[in-house]
Structure formats: C-alpha cells, structure tokens
UniProtKB/Swiss-Prot annotation:
Pfam families referenced in this protein's UniProt entry, alphabetically: ABC_tran, NIL
The reaction(s) this protein catalyses: L-methionine(out) + ATP + H2O = L-methionine(in) + ADP + phosphate + H(+); D-methionine(out) + ATP + H2O = D-methionine(in) + ADP + phosphate + H(+)
Topological category with respect to the lipid bilayer: Peripheral membrane protein
The protein, known as: Methionine import ATP-binding protein MetN 2
Protein species of origin: Pseudomonas entomophila (strain L48)
Primary localization: membrane
SUPFAM superfamilies (UniProt xref): ACT-like, P-loop containing nucleoside triphosphate hydrolases
C-alpha cells in the first residue's frame, strides 16, 4: 500500500517558493492500477518522483508497505528503489547496447546475480513482453512499441512490487498504445504488481485503471473508481478530460439540440443494464416517445457502459423519469 499523508512539495526558484504539490493525502491499495491524470504542470510527475523518492517532500509522510520512506537513509533508499520499477515516455534505452543488455543492466548494476542467472532472467522477461526473438537487436532496429516493451522488461528485471509509468504511451500510435496497455494489464493481473501511471489521456485511464485521481494546479480535484469518475464527473477539469475523450463539445451539442422538441436527457448505463431493452419498455409503460440524438457503447476496463442522449416527447414524463431511476440508470436532464 502507498499512502500520502498531507504531502506537499515546494521548489525554491530565484528566491521564491514555487508550490509543485499542495498538501495531498492519497491511498493506493496493493495490486491496484492507479491513474494520475492532469495537464502539464498539474503536479502528477512530482507525485511519481515522490513515490520513488527521487524527490524529497517538503512536508508530510509517504508510507509504503507500512514504512515511512521519507525517513530512509541512503542505504534504505537504494534497497527500496530496487522494489520500484520505472517506465519512461521516451524509453531511455542505451543505443549502444542490445535489447538483452538493456534489460540486464539493472541486474548487472545490483551485482547480486551471476551472469548465468542474469541471462536466464532476461530470457524470461523478453518472453513475457513478446520480444524473445529480438534479444540481439539494438534499439535503432525496433519500433516504438517494441522499445517500450524493452523498457517494461527492464523495469521488471529486479522483481519490483511497484511499477511507475511516466506517460508510457504518449509517444505511441493508438494501436501500439492499446497493445502496451494490454501488456500492462496482464502484468498487473499475473504478477499482482501495484501500477501507478500518469497520463493526460482519459482513454488510457479508462482502458487499464481501477482508480483515478484528477490533478490540476498541484491539487487532486477529484478521485475515485474510474467508472464513477468517468461517467459522473463533478469537477470542471474532469469534465473537460471526459469531453476530450468522447470528442464532444457540450456547448456545440446543446446548440445542435436547440430546435429539437421535447425534454432532452442523457442516460448512463453500466454493466448488464447496458444491453437491457429499457427504452422500449419505458415507452410502452409510459407512452413517452423518444428519439436518439447521440450515443455510444464502450468499456471501462472490463465493465461495459453506454450513454444515450434522448429527446422525450408526450406521455407521462415523470413516470418515465421514475422508471429510469428505478432501473439504476443515471439520468441527467439537459433541458
């Protein structure tokens, strides 16, 4: 478990204190995939560097597995960092070394295994990330996705308990991003690793995370289970991320609906309710006609969800609203 207890970070620049992270409390459970999302300067990279103690907090405590890592001396920090793997945005591979040697590097530096043990470990890791046939290649011979897989294998080399991902997919195309996220999900599931990833893309959070914290100006402005935050955003920053993911401009959409008659509502379905024939049932029971103005069906990690924007006309409108709520469907009245 990772706990931030009133942690804050301030930098001294030209004689002035510049806050990078305001007092923050946060808990990340063991085995969780936890996402930190925010635009540049939000403070998410600072939080990542605080977790692995590349940065020391200006105040507060960081507790990992019951130990206060803010109080560690140099030797304790060295041992602790061996339990924390790191995946970088731009891969950070050594161009002069082969794939196998890049993966082996943390083990060589640790100096605790024989060459034979290191070679065996590297072979296992390359097989795990699907690069068993690329061991003798150099980074320049690999695609972006393959380079990131090397980075993942290297991060796993010391058998870490925690894996930190710093914008790990932002330099990749959408198809490669999906395959890397699938690999991270498999690693989380099979190795029971705690994964903390930072991103500015809600789609990354939606695909792989269990919980998310939304950051803005050095503060966590909203946090919770991904489905709850994604489907029912409250803070303006969260709403903007959701709209960017859905590629929807709410202002333009409302203008498009300005001349549509009737009441306009947005329904959000989760789980089995996503596929239930609710609209037809409500229309028959209440006499309310509907037209579908916009909609989508997708998944948040393994949970299906659907969103429909409807125009409702005639019949018993209040009964229809009550029926939607009784079916455990979230309803937002837009007009």
């Amino acid at each position: 478990m990772i706990e931030f207890q009133n942690v804050h970070k301030t930098y001294r620049v030209d004689g002035r204190d510049i806050p990078a992270l305001n007092p923050t409390s946060l808990t990340i459970e063991d085995g969780q995939v936890f996402g930190l999302i925010g635009h540049s300067g939000a403070g998410k990279s600072t939080m990542l560097r605080l977790i692995n103690r590349l940065e020391a907090p200006s105040g507060g405590k960081i507790i990992v597995d019951g130990e206060d890592v803010t109080a560690f001396d140099a030797n304790q920090l060295r041992r602790f960092r061996q339990q924390v793997g790191m995946i970088f945005q731009h891969f950070n591979l050594l161009a002069s070394k082969t794939v196998a040697d890049n993966v082996a590097l943390p083990l060589v530096l640790a100096g605790e295994l024989s060459r034979g043990e290191i070679d065996k470990r590297v072979t296992e890791l390359l097989a795990r990330v699907g690069l068993q046939d690329h061991a003798r290649k150099y980074p320049a011979q690999l695609s972006g996705g393959q380079k990131q897989r090397v980075g993942i294998a290297r991060a796993l080399s010391t058998n870490p308990k925690i894996l930190l991902c710093d914008e790990a997919t932002s330099a990749l195309d959408p198809q490669t991003t999906a395959s890397v996220l699938q690999l991270l999900a498999e690693i989380n599931r099979e190795l029971k690793l705690t994964i903390v990833l930072i991103t500015h893309e809600m789609d990354v959070i939606r695909r792989v995370c269990d919980r998310v914290a939304v950051m803005d100006a050095g503060k966590i402005v909203e946090q919770g289970p991904v489905a709850e935050v994604f489907l029912h955003p409250e803070h303006p920053t969260t709403k903007r991320f959701v709209q960017e993911d859905e590629q929807v401009d709410e202002g333009e959409q409302r203008d498009d609906f300005a001349h549509v008659p009737g009441r306009i509502v947005r329904l959000t379905f989760q789980g089995d309710a996503t596929y239930a024939p609710l609209l037809g049932t409500v229309a028959r029971e209440t006499g309310v006609d509907y037209s579908i103005l916009a909609g989508r069906i997708d998944r948040i990690k393994d949970v299906p969800y659907g969103q429909l924007t409807l125009a409702l006309i005639g019949g018993d409108m209040e009964a229809a609203f009550a029926r939607f709520k009784a079916a455990d469907v979230h309803m937002e009245v837009l007009r």
